[in-house]
C-alpha cells in the first residue's frame, strides 16, 4: 500500500500500519516537500519515498505492486489524484472531504461498500467518523428528523489541510449525517479550541425524534460506542445519554416531509488519540487514521483473509 500526503495524518497512518497491521505493509510514502518530517521518518523506517506527488508514485518501481492507496492530502488535491490514478486499477481510501467515492463509516456501511466493489471510499471527516455512528445508532431505533453535530478540536491538532478544508468539512459531514447516519436533515459545526494545554476532541450530537423508548435509544448508542472503540480505543461516552422534552415548534429546522418532534436526544463524546505519532489530544486525527486502517484491513479480508497482504 502507499500513502499520498506526508503530513500529520499520513505520517500517523504510516506508523499505525507499521506497528499495528498484520495484513498490510508499507510500499511508499508520497509527499511534495522533500524536507517534510513524514518523508524523513519514512526513509528512516526503510519505506520508499518520493517528493514528486502522485506523478512520482506512478513512476516508482513499487507502484505496480501497490493495491491500496490512502490519500491524506486535501479535497482539491484528491480530486486530481483520483483522476490521475483512474487508469491503474488501484483502490483508493480518501481521508479528505472530497467525496469522489461513497461515504464510509465502518460500523454503519463498510461491509456494503466492500461487497459492492467500490474502488474509491471516502472517510467523510474526523467529526463524521466520531458522530455519524451515533446518529445511526439513534436512527436505527427511532426516526431522526434532524441531527446536528458539533466537533470541538484542539487548534494545535488542526494543520494546514484541516484549516483549508473547513467549508468542505461542514458540507461533507452534513451530507453524510443524512446519507449514512439516516437523519432527514443534518448540520455540522467545527470548533477550533485554542485552549492550552490542548483539550481532547469533544463531540456533541443532537437528534430530534418523536416519541421513542429512551432505554432502547440508550442501549443502541452504547452498543455503537463499544463497536467503534474496537478500532478507536480512546472513543468513549463522556456522560449519560440525555433526553429533553421539546415543547416549542421546530419548523425552521425540519423539512416539510418530516414528522412530529417531541424529544431531543443529546450524546456527548470524547476521543483520545492513541499517541502513535501525534499527541493524545489529537483524537480528531487518530479517529480518521484508525478508521482508514480498519477500512483497508476489512477490504483485504473481504477478498482473501487467509493470506498476508503485501504492499
Swiss-Prot record:
One of its GO terms (biological process) is catabolic process. Transmembrane segments: none annotated. It is an enzyme of class 1 (oxidoreductase). Its EC number is 1.2.1.10. NAD(+) binds at residues 6-9, 157-165, 284. GO terms for molecular function: acetaldehyde dehydrogenase (acetylating) activity; NAD binding. Keywords: Aromatic hydrocarbons catabolism, NAD, Oxidoreductase. It comes from the Bacteria. Signal peptide: none annotated. SUPFAM superfamilies: Glyceraldehyde-3-phosphate dehydrogenase-like, C-terminal domain, NAD(P)-binding Rossmann-fold domains. Gene3D superfamilies: Dihydrodipicolinate Reductase, domain 2 (3.30.360.10), NAD(P)-binding Rossmann-like Domain (3.40.50.720). It catalyses: acetaldehyde + NAD(+) + CoA = acetyl-CoA + NADH + H(+). InterPro entries: Acetaldehyde_dehydrogenase, Acetylaldehyde_DH_C, NAD(P)-bd_dom_sf, Semialdehyde_DH_NAD-bd. The active site is at residue 126. Pfam families: AcetDehyd-dimer (PF09290), Semialdhyde_dh (PF01118). NCBIfam families: ac_ald_DH_ac, PRK08300.1. Belongs to the acetaldehyde dehydrogenase family. This is Acetaldehyde dehydrogenase 2.
Amino acid at each position: 500500500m502507499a500513502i499520498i500526503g506526508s503530513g500529520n495524518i499520513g505520517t500517523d497512518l504510516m506508523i499505525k500500519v507499521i506497528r499495528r497491521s498484520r495484513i498490510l505493509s508499507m510500499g511508499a510514502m508520497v509527499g511534495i516537500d522533500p524536507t517534510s518530517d513524514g518523508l524523513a521518518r519514512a526513509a528512516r523506517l526503510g519505506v520508499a519515498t518520493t517528493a514528486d506527488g502522485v506523478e512520482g508514485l506512478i513512476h516508482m518501481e513499487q507502484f505496480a505492486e501497490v493495491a491500496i492507496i490512502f490519500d491524506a492530502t486535501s479535497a482539491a488535491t484528491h480530486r486530481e489524484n483520483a483522476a490521475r490514478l483512474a487508469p491503474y486499477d488501484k483502490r483508493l481510501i480518501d481521508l479528505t472531504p472530497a467525496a469522489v467515492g461513497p461515504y464510509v463509516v465502518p460500523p454503519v456501511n463498510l461491509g456494503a461498500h466492500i461487497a459492492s466493489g467500490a474502488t474509491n471510499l471516502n472517510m467523510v471527516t474526523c467529526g463524521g467518523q466520531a458522530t455519524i455512528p451515533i446518529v445511526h445508532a439513534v436512527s436505527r431505533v427511532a426516526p431522526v428528523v434532524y441531527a446536528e453535530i458539533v466537533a470541538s478540536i484542539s487548534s494545535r491538532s488542526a494543520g494546514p489541510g484541516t484549516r483549508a478544508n473547513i467549508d468542505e468539512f461542514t458540507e461533507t459531514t452534513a451530507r453524510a449525517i443524512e446519507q449514512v447516519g439516516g437523519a432527514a436533515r443534518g448540520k455540522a459545526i467545527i470548533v477550533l479550541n485554542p485552549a492550552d494545554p490542548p483539550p481532547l476532541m469533544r463531540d456533541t450530537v443532537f437528534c430530534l425524534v418523536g416519541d421513542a423508548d429512551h432505554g432502547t435509544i440508550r442501549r443502541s448508542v452504547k452498543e455503537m460506542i463499544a463497536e467503534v472503540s474496537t478500532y478507536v480505543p480512546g472513543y468513549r461516552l463522556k456522560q449519560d445519554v440525555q433526553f429533553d422534552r421539546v415543547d416549542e415548534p421546530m419548523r425552521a429546522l425540519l423539512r416539510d416531509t418530516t414528522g412530529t418532534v417531541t424529544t431531543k436526544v443529546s450524546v456527548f463524546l470524547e476521543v483520545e488519540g492513541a499517541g502513535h505519532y501525534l499527541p493524545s489530544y489529537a483524537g480528531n486525527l487518530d479517529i480518521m487514521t484508525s478508521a482508514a486502517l480498519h477500512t483497508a484491513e476489512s477490504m483485504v479480508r473481504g477478498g482473501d483473509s487467509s493470506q498476508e497482504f503485501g504492499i
